[in-house]
Structures are given as C-alpha cells and as structure tokens.
Amino acid sequence: MLSEFFNNITSFFVNIFSLFEGKRNIRILMIGLDGAGKSTLLYKLKFGDVIRTIPTIGFNVEIIEYKNLSMNVWDIGGQNNIRALWRQYDQRTDVFIFVVDSTDRERFDEVKQEIKNIIEQNKNESSNASLLIFANKQDMLNPITPAELVNSLDLNSLTNKKWHVQPCSAVRGDGIYEGFDWIVSNSSGK
C-alpha cells in the first residue's frame, strides 16, 4: 500500500516535469541478487561517480534524465528475504534491469530462476516490458562473457520478450551508457 502511494506520487511529478521538457517517461525496476552492484550502477549513472553504498534494505528511487527519456528508476534490494517484495513494485514497469555479478558463477541458477519468476509474474501487467541484463563486474578476474551468460540463463527461450545482455563495470562506468542506449531504442514509455 505504501509502495503504491510512493509510486503514484513519484509518477505524478515525473509526468509533470517531463511534459515541459518533451521527454518520454519510463518506469524502470532495477533488480538482481544481493551484491550484484545495482546501487553502484545506479549512482554511477546518476552522479558519474562511485558512491559507497551499503546493502539496500527496501528500495532507492532516482529520476534520471538520459537523452529523450525521463527514467523513474526503482532500485530494489536483492537479499533473499526482500525478493518476495519485488512483486509489489513491478506494476506499470516499462523496463526490467537485472544486474548480475558476472564473476559469481555459483549463483547463475538462482539468477535464472529469479528472471523466470519476474517474467512469469508479469505476463499480463508488464508484458511489453523490455529486459536489460547488465553483466556487471567485467573489470574483475574471470567474468562470464555475455554469450556464456545468455547460454547459462537460457535467454534464447525468451521469444516473447525484448531482451539484451550488456557487459559492464559499474565501478569504472564501462558499458553502462551502452545499456541505457539500448533502453532508449527499445522502451515503450509514455
């Protein structure tokens, strides 16, 4: 109930400001397992710097202006006990961003299941929502390649969903803008 209130208030102000600027509004839900780098990525995009973060308990909301978009980005914590709450925030989502720690191969089955859950839960409500997967931590030792991640997560089976895997390093900023360029080209915002 409280999340719906915040959602409505935030959407109202985003819509008002964007009307004056001629930008399309989109709602983004940024999710992923704990420790994947969601908040680091969000704040690198927002402020251009690495901001020291602590594990997100609940959510962070930022409005990011990028090219012709005004993006209302909801960064939701990824701890196991918080993931059940993802469903509370996904109404009217235009783009799902799933951030993956591309060095943590032991959790790829868990990532695959969570992506499957999100898509299954949103068959009707956000069926046109695009899916951007950031393969984060590419600056670390031995990260998985995008092609390997596509195979590991069986993404080619998502035939009714626009999706893209973007390698990135949230700390260095590599690949972040390319991912958001994909969103500009593939989102159906208002």
Curated annotation (Swiss-Prot):
Residue numbers binding GTP: 34-40, 75-79, 136-139
Major location category of this protein: Golgi
Any one GO molecular-function label of the UniProt entry: GTPase activity
Keyword Ubl conjugation: no
InterPro entries named among the record's database cross-references: P-loop_NTPase, Small_GTP-bd, Small_GTPase_ARF, Small_GTPase_ARF/SAR
GO CC terms in record: cytoplasm; Golgi apparatus; plasma membrane
Entry keyword set: ER-Golgi transport, Golgi apparatus, GTP-binding, Nucleotide-binding, Protein transport, Transport
Stored PANTHER family: ADP RIBOSYLATION FACTOR-RELATED
NCBIfam families noted in UniProt: small_GTP (TIGR00231)
Family note: Belongs to the small GTPase superfamily. Arf family.
Protein name: ADP-ribosylation factor F
Species of provenance: Dictyostelium discoideum
Gene: arrF
